[in-house]
Curated annotation (Swiss-Prot):
Location (main, coarse): secreted
Keywords (A to Z) from UniProt: Amphibian defense peptide, Antibiotic, Antimicrobial, Disulfide bond, Inflammatory response, Mast cell degranulation, Secreted
Name under which the protein is recorded: Esculentin-1SEa
Protein family (similarity comment): Belongs to the frog skin active peptide (FSAP) family. Esculentin subfamily.
Tissue specificity comment: Expressed by the skin glands.
Compartment(s) of residence: Secreted
Length: 46
């Protein structure tokens, strides 16, 4: 009924939020690693 429909919507939006947050975290990690690699390549310390 109405309750299960509401629950599904809530779960879906919760999952999307988790995925977005996880994606952001992973993206930031990748960015930091990329910056570190570029930095050491510029300095020639790789």
């Amino acid at each position: 009924g109405l309750f299960s429909k509401f629950n599904k919507k809530k779960i879906k939006s919760g999952l999307i939020k988790i995925i977005k947050t996880a994606g952001k975290e992973a993206g930031l990690e990748a960015l930091r690693t990329g910056i570190d690699v570029i930095g050491c390549k510029i300095k020639g310390e790789c």
